[in-house]
Amino acid sequence: MEVSPFYEKQIECIHCKKHFPTFKVRSKNIRVMSTASDFQPVYSDTQVHAYFYNVLVCEHCGFSFTEDFTKYFAPGTTELISAQITSKWVNHTFNGERSAEKALEAYKLAYLCAVLKKEKHIVIAGLLLRLTWLYRELKNEAQEKRFMKMALDQYMESFSNEDYARTQMSDERVMYLIAELSRRLEDYQTATRFFSRVIERQRNTLEPKIIDMAKEQWEILRETRNQTAQQ
């Protein structure tokens, strides 16, 4: 009998402390074929998108979060979430397989909860980047660009106050994303500046792959700017 790529896991809500079930993808079924220049994974099995399941939606109170959220709630935020989310929540579950549309709904809930909870800019940026990927999956270019710009703004804020310290995000990775999202949004000046800053670190980095990606995108950017200048 074929084993499902999904398994059910019990999660404790960090807001209401109740437990709820959610689907997760078995690690052996996560097969990334390639990665886009903004880190969107391309899976060999198009039916199994692991990042669709990153958001945990509490069926009891509606609070939606990822493993990147802290368990700390700043004073007043618990009450704000109860008023803005829980009081309007109609009990329903996000357990089960998720389509791109269902994942989009979950990520939008998580984004709202992150803003109300006053999560770090780096966490909010990650949610917005994945919303960008989802709209790309759905071939909605206008919304893809909209959320890309929102993600870029949050990465800029995070870089300015270094709130990504002690996370899995390095200086190089944050600067690279600022550069690449700027390039995609045709802000070539910002893209040039930040790609340069990443490449400058090539002799003293723990992220050689990011340096290589920055060089590749720098070349694409240079060609684009040359073509634009010739028009």
Residue ranges with predicted function:
Residues M1-L80:
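N-terminal cysteine/histidine-rich coordination modules
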Residues E79-F94, E101-L109, L116-N140, S170-R184, ...:
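Amphipathic alpha-helical repeat scaffolds of TPR domains
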Residues N95-G96, A110-I124, E157-Q168, R203-E207:
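Flexible helix-coil transition and linker loops at the boundaries of alpha-helical arrays
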Residues A106-L109, C113, F147, Q154, ...:
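Alpha-helical solenoid repeat scaffolds, predominantly canonical TPR units
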Residues V123, Q143, F147-M150, D163-D171, ...:
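Structural signature of alpha-solenoid helical repeat junctions
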Residues L152-M156, Y188-L206:
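TPR/TPR-like (Sel1-like) alpha-helical repeat modules
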